[in-house]
UniProtKB/Swiss-Prot annotation:
It catalyses: UTP + L-glutamine + ATP + H2O = CTP + L-glutamate + ADP + phosphate + 2 H(+); L-glutamine + H2O = L-glutamate + NH4(+); UTP + NH4(+) + ATP = CTP + ADP + phosphate + 2 H(+). ATP binds at residues 14-19, 71. Pathway: Pyrimidine metabolism; CTP biosynthesis via de novo pathway; CTP from UDP: step 2/2. This is CTP synthase. GO terms for cellular component: cytosol. HAMAP family: PyrG. Catalyzes the ATP-dependent amination of UTP to CTP with either L-glutamine or ammonia as the source of nitrogen. Regulates intracellular CTP levels through interactions with the four ribonucleotide triphosphates. It comes from Cereibacter sphaeroides (strain ATCC 17025 / ATH 2.4.3) (Rhodobacter sphaeroides).
């Protein structure tokens, strides 16, 4: 039976609960325990799949096709444990489940209420898989006091009451603001946050104090006294140069020991933190630097491409090279010649996205990389833009475009070399889709197998002719243009097992030019960099040596 750690936040949002949860999971693993991490989001969307990247940031996709919060990416990167659909839930999903049960008559005519029906649904979610691991770490999104989060806080309060004593603990992350005029840290916001938490029946066992400045011992003692927490369980959470320092930093501060003490686990197994020491060594002792241009649509918010940024860092680790990623709005290239902006970069990456805005700029970036011999990695829409560029400029399909862009305005302007995907094989059945289907949850989502051409660049990179990668798309390159494009040098080196869906394109007579329909960044980890990103950065290093 799993022990439960509930991670909550107070004072302000975006303090780093997800990273704290991921780091704690990594530390418990380092002591020999098995872990699973979960995220409970209070928003009323069923999932983040239809939310704007500017609202939510990246949508992280799991192997089984769940569209989830980017924190699940942190969980996977830090622990290596693949997330599942059952590791993410929102208020919208909970209420949807409750209302479906009411319509079916599952409640036998009872009046449906937040307590007990909504809270019971949340508790049922928490119980799934509790016999599989030693520790279940559950992060509650938002901050204590948010009206949307109240059912979740009530549910975890009840859940802890239902379990035997010592099976659940609460870790609360707050902010210690620094007042520069008086040169002091203020503890009152933390005290009020804990007071708010205690008022709804939850007493924190461990406090994490986010601070930019050193926390004096007397302030820790004061917080321990007023918040009724052991002084050893008052843990500093300082700002760090890199998120990958978090496991070592939290271990130095005693987080993992405080958690094990709260559970009464003694003597605690000693941690083996060698993998994290190696990660930091590779980051701190990089032997060079490469510049990578990310030509995207949502560049104002880097969280929109969080996994890509981290995967590039991992690729740098694999080559002991520092990666300086620079974000360029693709719309700029629709007005300007990309050459002055892209000169000096050692590689170009065009990530995924939706809609026509910025796509002509991405096409011009792909053309620049192809013509100048600059390493290019196109992901999802980035692959489609590379194909459209090749169709226009090499295969002489002058009006080549995507069916997505015509569908947006309701009239035909392009010859669609990229079309709306109407059916595909998933497991043992065929999935069918129409243009007027609901937007949410209707894309080709999750892990799918691809067959790679023997002798191709990607087969060499992967060391295999069969791979499995995660997808999130509803448009696909039309395989009917394969012959024309391959005749111009663009090889379809990866296909779905049935040969109908192009998964990878590459240019052989180019230092490094690869487009992939899937999202390799979602499977990259600091201690296991994704092979595509590792080789992409290797190619960038080669270019940097020629400059």
């Amino acid at each position: 039976m799993a022990r439960y750690v509930f991670i909550t936040g107070g004072v302000v949002s975006s303090l780093g609960k997800g990273l704290a949860s991921a780091a704690l999971g990594a530390l418990l693993q380092a002591r020999g325990f098995s872990v699973r991490l979960r995220k409970l989001d209070p928003y009323l969307n069923v999932d983040p799949g239809t939310m704007s990247p500017f609202e939510h940031g990246e949508v992280f996709v799991t192997d089984d096709g769940a569209e989830t919060d980017l924190d699940l990416g942190h969980y996977e990167r830090f622990t290596g444990v693949s997330a599942r659909k059952t590791d993410s839930v929102s208020s919208g999903r909970i209420y949807s489940n409750v209302l479906e049960k009411e319509r079916r008559g599952d409640y036998l005519g009872k009046t449906i209420q937040v307590i007990p029906h909504v809270t019971n649904e949340i508790k049922d979610f928490l119980r799934v898989g509790e016999d599989e691991v030693d520790f279940m770490l559950c992060e509650i999104g938002g901050t204590v006091g948010d009206i949307e989060g109240l059912p979740f806080f009530e549910a975890i309060r009840q859940f802890a009451q239902d379990k035997p004593r010592g099976q659940c603990i609460f870790v609360h992350l707050t902010l210690l603001p620094y007042v520069s005029a008086s040169h002091e840290l203020k503890t009152k916001p933390t005290q009020h946050s804990v007071k708010e938490l205690r008022s709804i029946g939850i007493a924190p066992d461990v406090l994490l104090l986010r601070s930019e400045h050193p926390i004096p011992e007397k302030e820790r003692e004061k917080i321990a006294l007023f918040c009724n927490v052991r002084k050893e369980a008052v843990i500093a959470a300082y700002d760090l140069k890199t998120i990958y320092e978090a496991p070592l930093a939290y271990h130095r501060e005693g987080l993992d020991q405080a958690v094990l003490d709260a559970f009464g686990i003694s003597p605690a197994p000693k941690p083996n933190l060698d993998r994290w020491v190696d990660v930091m060594d590779r980051l701190e002792h990089a032997e060079g630097e490469v510049r990578v241009a990310i030509v995207g649509k949502y560049t104002q918010l880097e969280d929109a491409y969080k996994s890509i940024a981290e995967a590039l860092t991992h690729g740098g680790m694999a080559n002991r090279t520092r990666v300086r990623a620079e974000w360029i709005n693709a719309e700029l290239f629709e007005r300007e010649d990309p050459s002055p902006f892209l000169e000096g970069f050692h590689a170009i990456l065009v990530p995924g996205g939706f809609g026509e805005r910025g796509t002509e700029g991405k096409i011009r970036a792909a053309q620049y990389a192809r013509e100048k011999g600059i390493p290019y990695l196109g992901i999802c829409l980035g692959m489609q833009m590379a194909v459209i560029e090749a169709a226009r400029n090499l295969a002489h399909v002058k009006d080549a475009g995507s069916e997505e862009f015509d569908h947006e305005i309701g009239r035909k302007r392009y010859t669609p070399v990229v079309y709306h995907l109407k059916e595909w094989i998933q497991g043992n059945h065929i999935v069918e889709r129409k243009h007027d289907d609901d937007k949410g949850g209707t894309m080709r989502l999750g892990a799918y197998t691809a067959a790679l051409a023997a002798g191709s660049r990607v087969a060499t990179i992967y060391g295999s002719t069969e791979i499995e990668e995660r997808h999130r798309h509803r448009y696909e390159v039309d395989v009917r243009y394969r012959e024309a494009l391959e005749g111009c040098g663009l090889t379809f080196s990866g296909m779905s097992p049935d040969g109908r869906l192009p998964e990878i394109v590459e240019i052989k007579d180019h230092p490094w030019f690869v487009g992939v329909q899937f999202h390799p960044e979602l499977k990259s980890k600091p201690f296991a960099p994704h092979p595509l990103f590792a080789d992409f950065i290797r190619a960038a290093v080669e270019v940097s040596r020629l400059v």
